[in-house]
Structure formats: structure tokens, C-alpha cells
Amino acid sequence: MTTGAEARVNSAPIEAGLRHLVRIAGAIAGLPEGQVRSLMAEAVDEVDPVSVEEIILQSYLFAGFPRTLNAMRMWRVVSERPAPDSDPEAAAEDFDLWRRRGAETCEIVYGDSYERLRRNVCGLHPALDEWMIVEGYGKILSRPGVDLRTRELCVVAACAVSGQQRQLHSHLHGALNAGSSPGEIGGV
């Protein structure tokens, strides 16, 4: 799932579980449902099901809510796992916690570019900056269950498949900042 710019990076094999998650993330972002279902079926016995669910949940940031709903519906069928009874992480009881976690996670991903990112996004619209930090990085990308390195590699796959070049560029750097090697990124 590489584009021209990423293909120049020397790739290295990534472990099987991570490879499945990355492929699922990319598929949700831009492939037909049948292909998403096939990739899920290949992964069902090889990947922690909670990790798959976390990658599906985060896909709503990069693929939209309809694709996320459809992907989770497919995962329920393929995995034969029921939804959890509750998800305390999803409750809006501690909005300040989401904001704090979001700022911390976003700063890891963007590194030295963090302050400039915040200014640029706020310059587009203050609501987008708030949503990026609270919703994107705090509520979603800071959830437990999957480490930030894995999440960022999955974001790279989603951005590559969906042709989101600006976000792809940023998240290639973000994957490095979150601990991925250039070879792992090339393997995506």
C-alpha cells in the first residue's frame, strides 16, 4: 500500500499482526467492502481482536463514519465477537482528560512542528483545532488497546490508500516520531 514517495523508502518486513492491522486500516479507507471483509478473514485468527476493533474505531477519523460502521459490522460477522457491553473510554465524563491526552499525543506525533500545526489548523477554523486535539488525538488516538506506533502506521496506510497527500506526509513523520523505523514505514 505504498505510493510513489513512500516507495523510495527501503522497506523491511513488518510482523504479521501489524501487517494485518495496516492492511485492514488501508482497506477501510479506500477499498470495496468485499476486500475489507477478506482481509479481516485473513487476520481473524492471527491478530488480537481488540487491536482490530481499535483500528476500526480510529478509521472514522480518516475514512468517515459510514465506512467505520460498515467495517465494524463486517468485523462482528467475521470475528463472531459481540460488541463489548460498555466502553468507559468513550464516555465524555472527562473532557479535560481528552484535551490533555490529545495535546500530549499530538505533540509526540508532530514533534517540533506541533506549535506550527496548532497555529495553522486554528487559522483554518478554531473548531477544527479543538476537534483535532480533543476528538482526534485525545478521544481516539490516545485510547488504550493499541500503541501509538501501530496507530500511526495504520494512519499512514489509510492516508496512502485514500490519497490524502498532506496528511500522509505529516503522518509519515508522525510514525517516525512514534517509534517506527523507516523500514517499517516502507513496509506499509
Go through each PLM region and give its residues:
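Acidic, glycine/proline-rich low-complexity segments that act as flexible tails and inter-domain linkers
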Residues: 1-19, 26-51, 60-148, 177
